[in-house]
Amino acid sequence: MTKANMQRQDTRYVALLLALAILMLLVPRVSAAEYTASGATKFVFTDRVITVTEGNYTGYKIEGTELTINGAGTYIVSGSCSDGSIKVKKGTTGVTLVLNGLTLTSAATAPIACNKSTEVNLVAASGTSNTLTDSAKNNDDNYPDNADAENAVLKCKDGSQVTISGSGTLKIIANGKNGIKSGATTDEEGTASLTIRNVNLTIHAPVNDAINAEQTLNIESGTTPISAADDAIHSDYVLNIG
């Protein structure tokens, strides 16, 4: 890529960010109840294990530093882990996943993956800072032997309906490919959508897109500083802002 092309891309991103900033100022911030902590099941990540405080919701499985959610409920995650992941099992609905001061890195896959036909509200809890990071290996173009590659830090697969909300902060660092990847609507998996609402979301994507959505992308409110090597925001179908 020539220096002139890089300058044109930088200008494009700056213009996009300015436009988004103006739109966000015009949209009133929503004051919504983020989640109900009472009865929630709580997890704390470390580099070696995940510890759990039982609540009312038992739809989960732990293997080492891998957490799988397979039942509806409110699940609160915190702590720090240099190689771990959270997955919401295919077809699981009614999930509220609360990031309550979580720093989660994955060495080969997506730190958080919402599998096909899931319904997930991902909440950055008030007063907390949360960071999700992947590695260069989370890219099956460059690492075709990595069967676990999801090509995004936050992967939302076909038919998934995911909302990112909360008054805390969420930082996404995409060393593999995309920051957030949202899948498609299909007859088999159902309707897909990604909604960003009332959250302080920062995305650094030095390899590809910051946000890549194959279906409906709703950016309703909040602040979203973005840097990306390719598209800051890419939507194949419908992009709604405000």
Predicted regions and their residues:
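Bacterial N-terminal signal peptides that target proteins for export
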Residues: 3-16
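Generic N-terminal leader/processing signal
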Residues: 1-3, 198
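A composition-driven surface/loop motif
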Residues: 13-16, 28-242
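Hydrophobic core
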Residues: 18-26
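Generic low-polarity alpha-helical segments
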Residues: 1, 22-23, 32
